Amino acid sequence: MTVQLSDEAYAVVEGRHADPFRYLGAHPEDGGTMVRVLLPDAVAVEVIGDNGDVAPLDQAHPAGLFVGPLPGASPRYTLRARFGDTTVELQDPYRFPPILSDFDLYLLGEGTDQRLYDKLGAHPMELEGVAGVGFVVLAPNARRVSVVGDFNFWNPLRHQMRVRGSGYWELFVPGARAGDHYKFDLAGPNGEQLPQKADPLAFAAELRPKTASIVVDATTLPRPRPAPENINALSAPMSIYEVHLGSWRRKEGDQWLTYRELAEQLPAYVRDMGFTHVEFLPVSEHPFDGSWGYQPTGLYAPTSRFGSPEDFCALVDACHAAGIGVILDWVPGHFPDDPHGLGNFDGTALYEHANPMQGRHLDWGTLIYNYGRTEVVNFLTANALFWLERYGIDGLRVDAVASMLYLDYSRPAGGWIPNKFGGRENIEAIDFIRRFNTEVYGKFPHSTTAAEESTAWPQVSRPIEFGGLGFGYKWNMGWMHDTLNYISKDPIHRKYHHGQILFGLHYAFSENFILPLSHDEVVHGKRSILGRMPGDEWQRFANLRAYYAFMFGHPGKKLLFMGSEFGQEREWSHDRSLDWHLLEYPKYSGIQALLRDLNKLYRSLPALHQLDCDPFGFEWLITEDANRNLFAWMRKGNDTRARCLVIVNFSPNVYQDYRVRVPFPGRWREVFNSDSAGYGGTNVGNGGEVRTLEGLVPELSLTIPPLAAIFLTPED
C-alpha cells in the first residue's frame, strides 16, 4: 500500500510537530478509521481491534511510521509490534484523552494552582483501565517536546507530547511506571535541538553526575507523624541545630550516612543535646557537592545522595517522633546554569530573566528567577507548600533574601536595571515573598518561615497587612557579626569595643530574631567558632563557654551549626565528617556538656524564651562597666516571678562582692555557671545560691568568675 505523506506526517517523523495527536492515533478517513503509529525501530506493526480482529499496518516511512485501517467500530485498540526477534503488545499513547482538564489549564494560566505538583511532572495513573505515567511540563516557546526514558529507549520520536493552553505539554505513556528514568527532549523556537532537560517537578533524580529524573508515585509516600503543634510559636523555646547531612557523620570508608541511618542516629543526638529543631542545609537535588545544596536543579526532589523520597520521609518521621521540629533551608533566589537544569529551558529565558543585568548573579555565577512571571511564582510557592504537605516539614529558612530584594545587589554602578519607579527595590520579588508567606501560613498556620536577610530592610518579620514581608523570623546577622568581632578581641582591648555588645539591643526587638552561628561562619578562612577565641588554651575554651552562655541569655531564638556544640577546631568541610574523636578529651566534652545544659535551661526557664521577641522580656541592669568587660541584664517571662539574672564577664579577672540590684529580696539560686569544673572551668562562683543584702533596695553581692557567665533565678 502506497501512502502519500502530508506535510503534517513529515513534521511528526522529523520531530517538529506541536500536536502529534492531530496526526497520530485513530482518525476518521474515507468512511472508516485510519490508525497512524510512530514506532522507531519496529520491523512490523499490527493493530488489534477491540473486537479481537487483527490488521497489519503498512510502513509509510522508514523512521517507523505505520499506517492502516482499524478493524471494528470501537476506537479502542492495542498494537502488536516486532522489534528484531522480539514481539510485544503495547498501547498507543495517542489514543488516550488529555491529562489536564480545562479547569487545570485555567489555574495554571492564572498561576494560582497551589498544588501544582499534582499536575506537572510525572504521575503514575490509570486511564481507561490502562496503567502508565502522565507527563506534563511547561515549555511555551518550544517547537516540540518529547519525553524520553527507560520506557522508549530514550528515543525522542517515540513519545512526542502535545501542547495545551499556556504552553503546557502533556502525554500519557502507557506502561511507564514508578522507578523509570526520564528526561524531556526539546526543540527550541527555531527548531534547534536543546540539551535534554530534567523534570523541574521531578520527585526524585539520579545520583550525580547522572542527571535523569525518576518517576515516583508520591501518593504512596508515607506521611511523617506531626511535630508538637506549637513548636514554632514565638513564646516557645527554639534552639536550632543546623546540619549538613553529608558531613555530620560518616561511616566506614568515609561514606555518607543514608537518610535511614541518619534517622537512627541524628534525632536521638539532637534530643539528648536539648535542641528543639534541626535545620537541614538544602536537601533539594543539586549537581555539585561543593555548593552544599545552595545551587539546586531539582527543587521537588530530596537529593538521592542519601536515599529515596521514602527514606527522607523516615528521617523526618524519626525527628518528629523525638519531638524535634524540622526546618529546611530553601533556595528560591537563584539556580545554576547546568545544561539539564532550568536555564534556557525551552530555548528562551523561561525561568530566568533574559537580560543578564537582571538574570545572572555575578557573585555565584547562577541565574536569577524572573518573579514577574506568574508561572515562575506558582512554581516556587507550590514548591514551598509541597515540602510542608508531602514531607511534613515544619518550617522553611529562605536563603539569600537580600539578593532577591535589591536589583543592584552585588552589582557595579550601571550594571543593573532600576524598577519602574527608578528605584533599586525588586518589586516583583517583594510580591513573591509576600505571596509565599501568605500561602504558607494560610495553609499551614503552625509552620514557620525565616529569612536570611543581611541588610536593614524593615519589617522582614512583620505582618504583610502592616507593610511587612510576612516572615515568622529573621536571622540577626548584625548580632552575629558584632559579637563574633567582639569576642575575637583580646580581653584587654574589649573595653574599646563595648558598644558592639550593647548595640544589638537597640534593635533586638525590631524583628523576631534568630541568633545564628551558622555554617557560613566556619568556612572560607573564617576559622571555627572556637578558632576565633583569643588567648591561651584555657582562655580559648573559657571565652567560648562565656560566649555561648551570653548567646543563650540574650533575647532571640538560637541557631548553632553542627560541630560548634563541642568545639570543633577545624573549619567545616562538606567532604569529611565532624571531628567526633575530640569528645575523648575533657575540654571538648565540657563544651558539649555546657551546650546540653544551656539548652535544658533555655527550654525549662520561661524567662529565657517566652518573651524572646518582646521588649518586655528584657531589662538592662549594667551597661557601663566597660573597664571590667562586664554586662548584666534581667530576662523576664509572663509570670511576675519568672526572672533570670544574666551576668557575663568577658575579662579573665575574678570580681568579688560585685553588687547587682534585683527586683525581689530573698534567695537567688545560681542555676548556671559556665566556669563550672564540669565544663572545664575553675569552679569560681557563689556556692549555688546567694541572698540579697539587707537594705531598702534588694541587692546581691556576687562573686563573678573569669571569662564566664552566671544565671540566677529567684527562689519561689
Curated annotation (Swiss-Prot):
Catalytic activity: Transfers a segment of a (1->4)-alpha-D-glucan chain to a primary hydroxy group in a similar glucan chain
Entry's Gene Ontology molecular function annotations: 1,4-alpha-glucan branching enzyme activity; cation binding; hydrolase activity, hydrolyzing O-glycosyl compounds
This protein's UniProt keywords: Carbohydrate metabolism, Glycogen biosynthesis, Glycogen metabolism, Glycosyltransferase, Transferase
Active site: D399 (nucleophile), E452 (proton donor)
Transferase keyword on record: yes
One annotated Gene Ontology cellular component of this protein: cytosol
Pfam family, one: Alpha-amylase
Pathway info: Glycan biosynthesis; glycogen biosynthesis
GO biological process: glycogen biosynthetic process
EC number: 2.4.1.18
InterPro entries, per the entry: A-amylase/branching_C, Branching_enzy, GlgB, GlgB_N, GlgB_N_E_set_prok, Glyco_hydro_13_cat_dom, Glyco_hydro_13_N, Glyco_hydro_b
Function comment: Catalyzes the formation of the alpha-1,6-glucosidic linkages in glycogen by scission of a 1,4-alpha-linked oligosaccharide from growing alpha-1,4-glucan chains and the subsequent attachment of the oligosaccharide to the alpha-1,6 position.
Family assignment from sequence similarity: Belongs to the glycosyl hydrolase 13 family. GlgB subfamily.
NCBIfam families referenced in this protein's UniProt entry, alphabetically: branching_enzym, PRK05402.1, PRK12313.1
Subunit structure: Monomer.
This protein's name: 1,4-alpha-glucan branching enzyme GlgB
